[in-house]
Amino acid sequence: MKQQAFDVIVIGGGHAGTEAAAAAARLGVQVALITLERSGIGVMSCNPAIGGLGKGHLVREIDAMDGVMGRVADKAGIQFRLLNRRKGPAVQGPRSQSDRDVYRSEMLAEMESLPNLRILEGEVADLITSGTRIEGVCLADGSEVTARAVVVTTGTFLRGIIHIGNRSFQGGRMGAAPSVRLAERFDSFGLPLGRLKTGTPPRLDKRSIAWDKLEPQPGDEDPTLFSFLSAGPHLRQVHCAVTHTNERTHEIIRKNLSRSAMYGGSIEGVGPRYCPSIEDKVVRFSDKTSHQIFLEPEGLDSTTIYPNGISTSLPEDVQEAYVRSISGLENAKITQPGYAIEYDYVDPRALDAALRVKGFDGLYLAGQINGTTGYEEAAAQGLVAGLNAALEGKGKFLPSRMTSYIGVMIDDLITQGVAEPYRMFTSRAEYRLSLRCDNADQRLTPEGLVLGCVGKERRIKFEKKMGLLDETLKKLKSFEVTPKQANEAGIRVNEDGRRRSGLDLLSLSNVSYESLAATWPELQASTEIAKQAKIEATYANYIERQQRDVMALKKDEEIEFPPRFDFSGLSGLSNELKSKLTAVRPSTLGQAARIEGMTPAALTLLLASLRKAEKRRSA
C-alpha cells in the first residue's frame, strides 16, 4: 500500500482549504493539500466577488496575518468599490468583482509557490484513527497519507444534493461529485450533523443582454484594495450594471412556486437569511414591486454574466420565463441554470476555539462544514484551523472577539451554533469602532509575527508604516495651539483659553490633515500616513472609552473553567442552562455569557463558583 507522510493534511482546495494549507505551510510544517482536481483549487463556486460589509473586514484580517485571499483578490479584481463610503471608516467595507479564471490561476500559483506544500489529487474516502486521535486519511485509490493533524474543508460537498425544480441529483457543486463516504465517517464519530442549503442564479450570455437599457455601475475612481501589500489594481477595470424585477416577474414566480424545489418540499435544509432566493424574496417581501439585480461580469475574456439577486431552484423553463420578463434581459440566453444545493454541516458547538473537534486530537473543521456561508468566512476559518493544525501540541492561535472579526465569528459559532448559514456583519461586533479595515494590520500583524506566519516583505512594510505613524501621532500630540491661533487658521474652536493639540484639531469633522499641514508645514506627512492619522484622531476619544470597557470586561471574561467542570451539579441554575452549558462546554466565562438564554444572575453564580474553586485549589 502506497503511503506518504506529512505534518498537516488539508482536505479540500476551496477558500477555506487554500487558506488553511497556506497558513500551515507558512509556519514551516510539511503540508498536503488534497483535492479532487488541481484545476478546482480556488474556484469561485458562486458569485465572482470578494468582500463587502463585514466580509471585507475578514479579508483584511486574513491579509494582516499574511494570508492569501486579499492578494489574490487584488490581482484578479476587475472592479473595486468601497461600500458604506458615506459612513464612518468602522463600517466601510471594501468589495471587488473578480475575474473568475484569474482568481483561480492566481490562487493555484500561490499554493504552488510554497516549498513545503504539496498538492495531491484524489478523493478522501476515510480518516485513519487511533482511538480518538486522527492520524491521516485513506484515499479512494487505497493509498494512505499520514499526518499529526487533519483539516477538513469540504464546503458544500458533504452528501451534497443539487435541486433544479423537481429534479434532484448528487453533487458538491455543478459538475462535481459529492463527498459521501467522509460524511458517513462523521456519522460514525457521533458528530452532530444538520442540513443547510444555498443557491446560485442562472448564468447569462452577455452578448444576449440589451446593455443600453441598463443602469451602469462603475467602480471607484480611487480603488480601495484588500492587501496592505498591494499598490494598485492589476487588471483593466470594468462596469457592472443594475436592473430590477417587476410585477410580471413576480407573477411568473408566484404561479410556479409549487414547482420550486424549496417550496415544493424537496429541500429540508435552511437557506441563508441574507442571501435569499428570488422565490423567497417574492414570498417574504410580497409588498415590494421590484428587487434589484446586479449584472456582474465573470471575467475580462468571459462572455458569462452573474445576475446577483435571482438565485433559484425553479425549473429551467420558469427560470427562462422570469429572466426574460426583466428589463434588458428580454432576449437573454441562459448558459447554466440556477440551482439550490443542500449539504451536511457539523454543529459548530462541537468545536473548540481553535476549530478542533472536541473529543478528538488532530481533527479540525473550517468553512461551510461549520455552518457558515461566504468565501470570506470560509477563508478566515481556514486561516485559524491551518495555524492551529500546524501548532498541534505546541500552542494555539485563538483570535479574540475584542480584537478581530475573525474572533467574533468563531466565538459566535462555537457558543451559539447556527440555525441558518452564518454571515458576517459589522453589527455582530461589540467593539467595531476599533475593529476597522484600516487598522487590521495594527491589530493582527504583531500577533502573526510572534507566531511566525508573517513573511519578511510584510514585516518590513509594517514596521516602516508603524514607525512613520507613531512619529506622526507623537508630533500631533506634542504640537499645540491657542484658541486664537486655531481660529486665525480658520479652525473654529471655543475661546476658552484651553490649548489644543494637533490631534485635537484633527479630530474635528471639518478639519483635514492636508489643511493642518498647509497651515503648519512641520506637520507634513505622506498621503497614507495622513489618512491613517485622521482616522486615529477621529476615533481616539471613543476608543479610549471603549478600551476601558474592554479591560473591565476582559478581567472576568478570560476566567477559565476547569476541563471537567460539572455544570449539571450547580444548584441555582435552570435545567435549560445546565443542559446548554453541558452541551457547549464553554472554556471561559466570556464564552458562557454568550450562550443563548444566559442571564446575569446565572453568570454571577458561575463566577462565584469559579472563584470558590480557585480558592480551594490555592488553599
Swiss-Prot record:
One of its GO terms (biological process) is tRNA wobble uridine modification. FAD binds at G12, G13, G14, H15, A16, G17, V124, S179, Q368. SUPFAM superfamilies: FAD/NAD(P)-binding domain. Keywords: Cytoplasm, FAD, Flavoprotein, NAD, tRNA processing. It is found in: Cytoplasm. PROSITE patterns: GIDA_1, GIDA_2. NCBIfam families: mnmG_gidA. This is tRNA uridine 5-carboxymethylaminomethyl modification enzyme MnmG. It comes from Dinoroseobacter shibae (strain DSM 16493 / NCIMB 14021 / DFL 12). The lineage of its organism: Bacteria, Pseudomonadati, Pseudomonadota, Alphaproteobacteria, Rhodobacterales.
